[in-house]
């Protein structure tokens, strides 16, 4: 953590992944954010990293953070949710409402804004999906996602080919 968020070098790296928001390369991969700080900013940085990997199609887990005064090593119980997720079949994964909503927003943008994204999403079959892959999505999340998609799809005008 640097000045309450990610360091400049990490921010620069994350900025270079901007196209991944449109053509996510890490779909279905679990990510364990790790944060260290001298004092404050751990929670905000963890949230920032979790949001960034959500853009990539990954699913962030509860991260592990340490401050300078907390030098205890990472314990197995802290890693267990991540280890379980590594072995979880995709069909049993349950995305959050945020992930379902973000997927639908990405889908509308892919289908309406840029030809390169439209082709990518259609090749993956995501243009007809409720989420990147078949998984456990509650009825409420599924309906909210479909409603959001329908509203945005009607409102966003196609912007040509680029």
What does each model-found stretch correspond to?
Residues 1-59, 130, 135, 139:
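Helix-loop-strand module that forms the ligand-binding subsite of alpha/beta enzymes
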Residues 59-162:
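Glycine-rich phosphate/pyrophosphate-binding loop and the adjoining helix
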């Amino acid at each position: 953590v640097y000045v309450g968020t990610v360091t400049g070098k990490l921010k620069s790296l994350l900025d270079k992944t901007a196209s991944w928001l449109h053509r996510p390369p890490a779909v279905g991969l679990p990510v364990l954010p790790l944060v260290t700080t001298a004092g404050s900013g751990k929670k905000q940085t963890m949230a920032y990293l979790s949001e960034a990997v959500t853009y990539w199609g990954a699913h962030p887990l509860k991260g592990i953070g340490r401050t300078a005064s907390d030098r205890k090593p990472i314990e197995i119980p802290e890693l267990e949710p991540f280890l379980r997720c590594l072995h979880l079949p995709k069909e049993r994964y349950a995305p959050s409402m945020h992930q379902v909503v973000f997927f639908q927003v990405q889908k509308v943008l892919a289908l309406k804004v840029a030809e390169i994204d439209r082709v990518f999403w259609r090749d993956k079959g995501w243009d007809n999906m409720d989420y990147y892959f078949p998984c456990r999505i509650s009825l409420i999340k599924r309906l909210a996602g479909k409603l959001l998609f329908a509203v945005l799809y009607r409102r966003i005008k196609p912007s040509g080919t680029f």
